[in-house]
C-alpha cells in the first residue's frame, strides 16, 4: 500500500529495467472481429461499444448533495444460492479435471438440485465403488454425498472497499448454503453507497501458489441497502379496515423504494442463478473515536511524518488502515495545508476507484486517518514484477484512473501526483487511488496554480517552466503512466533528474514497436503528452479522452459500476492478508509510538480544528461530506 508519507518532489522510483521491450506481456490479448483489442479478458461478458450517452452521463454536472446518513452499522447475512452454473469452457475444465484425476471414492447424488441420496444413479469404476455421472459445476467429488467446502462457491462482500470473503458451508456448488442468520458481517457506514457481492468457485486447475487469483467468477449482485431502520405502518383509526389495508400496502411499497431492508432473492449479473442476501441497518450513537477503539495488528508503511498500521475496529471486526501523522513534524515542515487537503478530499469523495476515508480523529500529539485497507498491492509492485502490462490490462487501469481523475476535477481538485506507488489494487483487481497530500483544492477549469510539486518523471512541461498550470496537468501524468504500463519506463526517464527535465521539455516522444504500443495507444499518448496544455487531449474535459478510439469498446456506465471483471486478480487470501506489503514494515511490532518534544501551543492546535470525522454531512465544506461523485450523475439503471 502506498503509505510512503515523505515521497514528494525529489524521489525517483523506477530504475532501468533490462529487456523491457522484449518481455512477454502479462496476459494474452483478446481481439474482436475487426482485429482490435478488447479492454479486459477473463470470464467477463462481452464489452459493448460505448456511446455518447455513456460518455456524457459520466461527465455530467455535480449532483445535488446526498442526504447525510446516520452513523451506524450495516449488517449483512448470506443465506443460499440456487441455479449457479459455469460457462461452457469451465464446465469442460471441471469435468475433465475430476475425471482425469479419477476421484473414484466419491459418492454423489445424481441430481444437482438435491442433497438427498434418494433415487441417485451411479456408474461403477474399476474399484467397484459408485461414481457420479453428473458433471459441470457439480463435477467435484463428494464424501457420503457431501461436498467439501473447498468445492463450494464463496462470496466476496465489498462495501466501501471493505472486502470480506464468506465461504458456503454446505449444499452443492449449484445450490450452496451459507450460515444465514447464524453469522452476520458488520460494516461501518460512513456514506450512502451500495454493497457489491461477487461469487467465485475455486479453480481446480489453478497453478500452484495462485491462491484465489485464478478462481472462477460466477456472477455478481448489487445491493442498495436502506440506511435507516424500518418504520412500521400504524393503523389510522379514522379509516376503514379496507382503507387501512390499502394505506399499509402503499406504505410498504414506499418503504421498498428506500432501499433493501431484510432478506431478498437477487438475480446474478454476468452469471446464472440467484442468491438470498439479508441486510439491516442499526444506528450507532457513538461518541468520537479514539485509538482504543482499534486493535493494532501490523505496520504496513512508515515515513518521517508517522506510520500506517493495519488495525481492526473492535465493534465491527472490520480491518482498516490507520495512518498516524505527528502534528509537530508537519508544522515544522509547513505541511499542514497538504495534510488538511488530504483529509478534506477524502471526506468529500465517494468514488469506486478512490480509497474512501472512514473516520478521522486526533490526540494532542497526532492526527489519525482511518481508511479502507486495500491490500492487493501497489500497481508499482505489480509493474516491477512483470516489467510491463499487455494492452488490455493497461487500458483497463487507465480507464478506471480516468474516471477517478474526472471525479476529482468535478470537485475542483487537481491530483498532481499520479504514479504507480499511489495506485492500489483491491481483491478483485480494480484500482484504488490513494495519497492525496499534493492535491490542490478549489481549482476551477480556468484557474492556474504555480506550486512546484510532484514526482520528477511525471512532471508536466508547464510545471517545469513555472508559468502556472491547470487541471490538464493530470492528463499529462495519465499519459506518462499509460506509457510506463505499456513499455516499462516513463517516456522521458533518465537517472539524472536534470537530464530528465530537459527531455520532458525538449525530447521528441518515441515509441517501441507496434506490438507493444499499438497505433490507437500511440495516437492517444501523442495527444495526452502534447507539451501545449491548451492542445492536450482533455483540455476540454474528460469526455474527449473517453471518446478516443483507444477506449472504443468500453461502456463507461458499466466501468463506473465495476461491472467488468479485471483480467488480473492479486493473490490475496483475506482482509488481514499483508503478503503484498514490505516485510521491512510488517515485521515491526505495531504500537502508537510516544512523541518526544514540547507540548504544542493552543495556536498550533487550532490549525487542526475540524479534523475529526465520523460521519458525512451534506455539502463540500471542510467538515466533510459524502457528495455523490459527478461521474455517476444522470446514469440510468
UniProtKB/Swiss-Prot annotation:
Q: Which GO terms describe its cellular component?
A: chromatin; cytoplasm; nucleus
Domain Protein kinase: start-end pairs: 294-551
Keyword presence, Membrane: no
Report the top EC class in one word. transferase
Positions of region (Disordered): 20-63, 104-140
Polar residues: bias regions: 40-61, 117-136
Residue ranges of every copy of the AGC-kinase C-terminal domain listed in the record: 552-623
Q: Which domain of life is it from?
A: Eukaryota
Q: What keywords tag this UniProt record?
A: ATP-binding, Kinase, Nucleotide-binding, Phosphoprotein, Serine/threonine-protein kinase, Transferase
Known InterPro entries for this protein?
Answer: AGC-kinase_C, Kinase-like_dom_sf, Pkinase_C, Prot_kinase_dom, Protein_kinase_ATP_BS, Ser/Thr_kinase_AS
Keyword NADP assigned to the entry: answer is no
Active-site residues, Swiss-Prot/TrEMBL: 417 (proton acceptor)
**Stated name of the protein:** Serine/threonine protein kinase ypkA
Q: What is the organism of origin for this protein?
A: Aspergillus fumigatus (strain ATCC MYA-4609 / CBS 101355 / FGSC A1100 / Af293)
